[in-house]
């Protein structure tokens, strides 16, 4: 099996929102932690910038042009949480481009003798709050949505599973694929919390009805809750949906050390969720792409990502974790019975 691939780019350090939790030091901390571990065997590549065609498959030209013009004018605030600097344009282009490169690496080489089964994009700013027509929540473009749409448009992938375990609901990703059965979007997030979306009853509409799976959890939820929801709700949903590609919107702000929420997930908890993902991906014989989202305690962020990637990149089979079924898992399994079969 080919070595896993990690996409990054120095432009991530040039996005400068000023005094802000989403800071360049996030990337510095991650790369230092990975370097200390020999990059976990990942082959490192520089991310290309996303093209206009790739961005416009998700976002209208008006939004893209607005971000570009604000950056070119010296920067400023899009909203109270979302601030750009002159360097933010290149950072955003390469962030979306890194996610696209993940897809190209995993599914873009038909007939390859030894394709990669794991690729990760380590970029900032994050993307999962960016809706089709609105940048928000620290996010300019929705990187994982651009990647999923690229997988389908450029490579003919019919079904993509996106698992978002950031502590904040991925409202932007939900918005993009709300009426689309070609993407199964599963989000585990604290409720109530910013951005205020992601109620359990939000399940998609039209052709996408039933293909949005929101799994809100109360403040104080830890390894048992998050792990059970992945293993006992997301994994059965994946088996029923039978995706050709799994993408993880990997935020690490559900960690017990993170200052922006009230999660209690530990490093081991992220590793457990990753083990569930790896086990079902192996069973379905599909590749896994990881796209960085949030995480604002530098130590928790870097440790959580390293713990997840160690499991996902492990040689040999990874056993599914043996976890008790949490009451929330039972409730959500009943709610999504039509999807789970």
How should these model regions be labeled?
Residues 48-72:
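Charged, often glycine-rich, active-site loop that binds/positions anionic groups
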Residues 11, 35, 60, 104, ...:
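Residue-level marker of positions within ordered structural domains that often coincide
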Residues 2-7, 15, 66-341:
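A general "terminal functional-core" signal
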